[in-house]
């Protein structure tokens, strides 16, 4: 296992936000909002998958993730790391390597042939599993994987997202009700703070983004999107 520096969480949040701006993973556009699969309209979009193509930034982010898990959850709390199909799979491999743990991955649905498996890899019954995703919006996709792992006999008390939206009360309730502690590196508020400090956009654009972060669903509805999040 690697040796990690347990950097202060606020410093990590700022550094990771800067990394995301550097690799152009973040997009702001208040004039032509993005439409998500949920039907929500948003002036912000982030592509966390880009991290896998930038080895130095990827390595630093995964070191931060490993340190966050050990600092906030403990050193001997897990038996394996699970990645969610598909974006979480490479990050599960990177994190498992750093934590010295086995890795599994979880499909969104059973594959429908062969063993009809939804969990790939070896997961002993009662294994304590850390679930990782590249990003979490309101927790719905992560709980798809958590529920499948629990149904297969695994124990899931913790999840980690490299990026957490951090703007939906529904997400806080979902994780609390699901008895899962969510760990994360950075949020939209951190990304916006870096953009403002480094003057990456004019104040009109930044204020438009901030208006969305303050009231995301009303903003979405006003711009032709959904006014509530899907329940699943």
Swiss-Prot record:
<dbReference type="InterPro" id="IPR023031">
    <property type="entry name" value="OPRT"/>
</dbReference>
<dbReference type="InterPro" id="IPR004467">
    <property type="entry name" value="Or_phspho_trans_dom"/>
</dbReference>
<dbReference type="GO" id="GO:0004588">
    <property type="term" value="F:orotate phosphoribosyltransferase activity"/>
</dbReference>
<dbReference type="InterPro" id="IPR000836">
    <property type="entry name" value="PRibTrfase_dom"/>
</dbReference>
<comment type="subunit">
    <text>Homodimer.</text>
</comment>
<keyword id="KW-0665">Pyrimidine biosynthesis</keyword>
<protein>
    <recommendedName>
        <fullName>Orotate phosphoribosyltransferase</fullName>
        <ecNumber>2.4.2.10</ecNumber>
    </recommendedName>
</protein>
<comment type="similarity">
    <text>Belongs to the purine/pyrimidine phosphoribosyltransferase family. PyrE subfamily.</text>
</comment>
<dbReference type="GO" id="GO:0000287">
    <property type="term" value="F:magnesium ion binding"/>
</dbReference>
<comment type="function">
    <text>Catalyzes the transfer of a ribosyl phosphate group from 5-phosphoribose 1-diphosphate to orotate, leading to the formation of orotidine monophosphate (OMP).</text>
</comment>
<keyword id="KW-0460">Magnesium</keyword>
<keyword id="KW-0328">Glycosyltransferase</keyword>
<dbReference type="GO" id="GO:0044205">
    <property type="term" value="P:'de novo' UMP biosynthetic process"/>
</dbReference>
<feature type="binding site">
    <location>
        <position position="137"/>
    </location>
    <ligand>
        <name>orotate</name>
    </ligand>
</feature>
<feature type="binding site">
    <location>
        <position position="107"/>
    </location>
    <ligand>
        <name>5-phospho-alpha-D-ribose 1-diphosphate</name>
    </ligand>
</feature>
<dbReference type="GO" id="GO:0019856">
    <property type="term" value="P:pyrimidine nucleobase biosynthetic process"/>
</dbReference>
<keyword id="KW-0808">Transferase</keyword>
<comment type="pathway">
    <text>Pyrimidine metabolism; UMP biosynthesis via de novo pathway; UMP from orotate: step 1/2.</text>
</comment>
<dbReference type="Pfam" id="PF00156">
    <property type="entry name" value="Pribosyltran"/>
</dbReference>
<dbReference type="InterPro" id="IPR029057">
    <property type="entry name" value="PRTase-like"/>
</dbReference>
<feature type="binding site" description="in other chain">
    <location>
        <begin position="133"/>
        <end position="141"/>
    </location>
    <ligand>
        <name>5-phospho-alpha-D-ribose 1-diphosphate</name>
    </ligand>
</feature>
<feature type="binding site">
    <location>
        <position position="113"/>
    </location>
    <ligand>
        <name>5-phospho-alpha-D-ribose 1-diphosphate</name>
    </ligand>
</feature>
<feature type="binding site" description="in other chain">
    <location>
        <position position="108"/>
    </location>
    <ligand>
        <name>5-phospho-alpha-D-ribose 1-diphosphate</name>
    </ligand>
</feature>
<feature type="binding site">
    <location>
        <position position="111"/>
    </location>
    <ligand>
        <name>5-phospho-alpha-D-ribose 1-diphosphate</name>
    </ligand>
</feature>
